[in-house]
Amino acid sequence: MNPRGFEVTGAWFQAGGNIISAIGNTRAFIGEENVEDPLVIVGESLQALGNVLQAVAPEHSINNEEDEKETTGQLDESVQEKENKQSDDAKEQKENNIKPMREQGKSLEKTGAEVQALGNISDIIGTILNMEKEQKENDYLIITGNSLQSLGAFLEVVDELRDVPNIQWLEVIGNSIQTLGAGLQAFQGIYNVLKEERMEKENADDQEAANKKEGEKKEVDEQLLGLIGNWVQAIGAVIEAIGETVEPQS
């Protein structure tokens, strides 16, 4: 598979995984909590696979470009000998200036995809451990996972914006939306953990009656925030996948 194939396939795996995770959280929101964790695990696994494919693509792209240059250089060797030496030196200098920038961009894109993949893995581990026994440490893993996904998507936005002559705006918009969506989920997780810690410090006997009334509403509000973030991230992933698909080949 060529580098572009890796990127497009990875983007659609990521989009599909986000949609599956969002469906799992939606079903939990309407009361079907028993199906949430398996769907989230499947969804996050697909996202991780998609991000790995996208992380591999830049490496293949750089290697292919170098191979092409080497082949072209060999074929045109006799022609280049006839060209003016000064012109050759100027071209070489210009190419040497552009190459590090291109490789740096590829490196940032690769880093963003790798960070998102780590976030997916952290989410998977936290969810699996919570299925066995719900603990605060597992929630920290999920918060870390969502935060890493938000950071990784942001790095990919920065990478796209640096490619000034050829900015792919669909990918910029898609990754920006993913940054927001994953950030909302991380915020929800942090809020939940802080609320639990605060309630542990309060006197359970004094607060029991008040918490009984407000607990259900607060829980719904918190779940709704995470659910919105989940679907926002899924929409962003679909937009990014469309952007990758329609992106003109360089």
What residue spans do the PLM features occupy?
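Membrane-active amphipathic alpha-helices enriched in small hydrophobic residues
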Residues: 9-26, 42-60, 108-129, 140-161, ...
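Extended, hydrophobic alpha-helical membrane-active domains that insert into or remodel lipid bilayers
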Residues: 1, 26-37, 58-77, 82-113, ...
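N-terminal ordered "arm"
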Residues: 4, 8-10, 30
